[in-house]
């Protein structure tokens, strides 16, 4: 597993203006879903632009272990021959998802609809993360889950339901992972499986299910929520998938370009799904010079080209209802806030506490060790921006790729270099991050 590797520290130094054009890796969320739905479909699914980070590769290995034929045919080009809904076979060994909560939780939903037994495991970070929120609805649908750890944590054994039940389920928190696990399990159940969420979470699973031929209806629910109804037991058909560039990965060069004076970069093919654009909305409110063009789409997912220039940023208040659309971007938003003039308040960040690390505490620690005034008030993060960051600190990454990349972006514009204690986990989502940033002019060493 990745956590057995020796730490690989890295320092980011104040850089000259960043320039150039880049395409960040394929979207991680869509890459996981393309592999899983391709495995549940009948026939061939061709995927181009797949993210070839460790998290997604572990999902590919899991689908192969469950009986699908999964092969790499070229650079970021993959082919999946699926086994059909409820067609998974019992794997010979535990399914190891490494650091990937998304891959693990979505696969649990997919397996829950097949009459097999599979053991799910991961690295130390994933073993520490809560799984009960996924286990509870799957057990309502007829699956049986056994875990020796408190809170239903990994490793756990999941016995899929022989006769899955359709359910109506209200998610306890806004979570695309919970919703997706229930919908994937619902593929095997007769009748209609319904998920209701009080705050709309990212809808990649719904869009891709439609792309593969499922009947799924989405309706508004209250002020900000959604009701999603899936008709079970469809025959999913293999379909081509073009994976757009990941907006969560694009966030790091984007913020780096905003805070390094004189920068002017372009990022191509970035997904612009409205449930993933909270960061861009917030940065524009802060005064960021971000322009989009060449808007188009594939498999229901829109994408665009972004031009990003060095900008004078100001502090803003970020409302809690925006959290689901940018839950993975708050770390790097905090970096932008540190370079802004004035106070930025980010509200309602409780979900950051159960990510790869306690990202709320880790973000505050990252800023404090580099001389930025920051406060945690309940689930709110308050950053006092002074227009510059002193830097000079060593950031503990806690095996979290997004902490590492956020800290490195900060170091490119801080007064003194910023060091991260380990960059190994960047490979889970963005293996080419360091060389790509160096091509744009970033100073690492």
From Swiss-Prot:
Phosphoenolpyruvate binds at residues 28, 101, 129, 177, 359, 402. Its main location: cytoplasm. The keyword ATP-binding does not apply. It comes from the Bacteria. The active site is at residue 328. InterPro entries: Enolpyruvate_Tfrase_dom (IPR001986), Enolpyruvate_Tfrase_sf (IPR036968), EPSP_synthase (IPR006264), EPSP_synthase_CS (IPR023193), RNA3'P_cycl/enolpyr_Trfase_a/b (IPR013792). It is an enzyme of class 2 (transferase). Signal peptide: none annotated. Its EC number is 2.5.1.19. Monomer. Catalyzes the transfer of the enolpyruvyl moiety of phosphoenolpyruvate (PEP) to the 5-hydroxyl of shikimate-3-phosphate (S3P) to produce enolpyruvyl shikimate-3-phosphate and inorganic phosphate. Belongs to the EPSP synthase family. This is 3-phosphoshikimate 1-carboxyvinyltransferase.
